[in-house]
Amino acid sequence: MELLKRKLYAKILMMVMVIWIAPMTNGHDHASHVPGGRPGAHPSHGAHPAHGAHPSHGAHPSHGAHPSHGAHPSHGALPSHGGQVPHSGWGHGRATFYGDINGGETQQGACGYGDLHKQGYGLETAALSTALFNNGSRCGACYEIMCEHAPQWCLPGSIKITATNFCPPDFTKPNDNWCNPPQKHFDLSQPMFLKIAKYKAGVVPVKFRRVPCAKIGGVKFEIKGNPHFLMILPYNVGGAGAVRAMQIKGTRTQWIAMKKNWGQIWSTGVVLTGQCLSFRLTTSDGVMKEFIDVTPPDWKCNGQSFDGKVNF
């Protein structure tokens, strides 16, 4: 009888141990699959819809072969021309036009460019409002512009322009002048405006983004001023388009930092007559390029232009 009691007690003890140990074992096994454990096979990693093949990436209808974009501006490795300048994100503003159908009144301008046709900019230009012009630092920058939110006035497609002028504010008209800060406004040449909107619209809402400048040929350098106050205008600049720093070097000198005079005209008081001139440009995205012995030693300060042969 005593033996039977001991066997029964042993069975009960074993059952209690099984019941007590089993949950601990199962709990430990589960811990290898929670987010704090090995992430490999966890449903929140790997093929989770928020990663990898997320519907907003890859083959999303608004990306890839979109007629007006190429790759979406909010993603990393985007196509560029002449450098590694990415497309920026879309901003929103307005656009008007100035001048006539032939681009009259759009030549020259606050960036210091001259004959825009000869310099390669043509009619694909715009004057920027104060908020965009940024004291001339955006001269030469390129933008893609699309009309939006006005189906009765907007035309499909987009245009690409180079910033060549400044649209000044008029504080006597605080409510009617589109170029007053902080408004982001493009005053386009008339032919470019008519590519995205109807003439009678006058002013339309637009979305815009900074894009790489695709230019034909090398960067050009125009020499102005006088031997004691040399002024250089770099134009037809690809890549970021806008120049943020410039240096000059004569045959017998080291690199000399130039000061921005106005627009995209840079100056130095160092006399460099009788020397071949080389230039070093840094664009607004930080890319630097050298243009060696661009001029012969007998250059003149009379508006001569010289081809740097290469571009960004």
UniProtKB/Swiss-Prot annotation:
Subcellular localization is given as: Secreted, Cell wall; Membrane
| Region: 6 X 6 AA tandem repeats of H-P-S-H-G-A, residue numbers | 42-77
| BP terms from Gene Ontology | anatomical structure morphogenesis; plant-type cell wall loosening
UniProt KW Repeat keyword: yes
What topology does the record note for this protein and the membrane?
Peripheral membrane protein
| Domain Expansin-like CBD per the UniProt entry, residue ranges | 228-307
Q: Give the signal peptide, or none.
A: 1-27
- Biased composition (Low complexity) is annotated at 40-77
Secreted: is it a keyword of this entry?
Answer: yes
Which Pfam families does the protein's record reference? DPBB_1, Expansin_C
Task: Give the UniProt keywords, A-Z.
Answer: Cell wall, Cell wall biogenesis/degradation, Membrane, Repeat, Secreted, Signal
**One cellular component (GO) term of this entry:** extracellular region
Q: Where is this region: Disordered?
A: 31-86
What are the residue boundaries of the Expansin-like EG45 domain, all occurrences included?
108-218
- The stretches annotated as sequence repeats are 42-47, 48-53, 54-59, 60-65, 66-71, 72-77
Family under the similarity heading: Belongs to the expansin family. Expansin A subfamily.
Its biological purpose is as follows:
Causes loosening and extension of plant cell walls by disrupting non-covalent bonding between cellulose microfibrils and matrix glucans. No enzymatic activity has been found.
PANTHER family the record matches: EXPANSIN-A15 (PTHR31867)
Please give the name of this protein.
Expansin-A24
